[in-house]
């Protein structure tokens, strides 16, 4: 909740969940950058590339900034169908088999929710020994990434 309050003025969502149908335990603090606030970024299997833009940020930019402070964040878990071992196997989307159509990723057709979460999401430092002051520094670092 502290991250959620501290980042409320940024174009991000913290631990999105259905308040009517679920009750999370919040053991991990995850954040998703709103689509229109995403700076250009590409993630490969072992490396990444991003470009900073005023008013926007990317998960990798934020993770690098947090790391420079000496704290550890990480990307949200990579969906299995994007991992090399499973890359050629079928997967299910809300519209059926994601590998069953040759145009599954053309705008206006298949929606790959897992890939979108992986692209725009990250896990923030979270430890039961983290102080409020340490969390405040992480919140400030994230604000700076959007400037």
Regions of interest found by a model, annotated:
Residues 1-147:
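PLP-dependent aminotransferase class I/II
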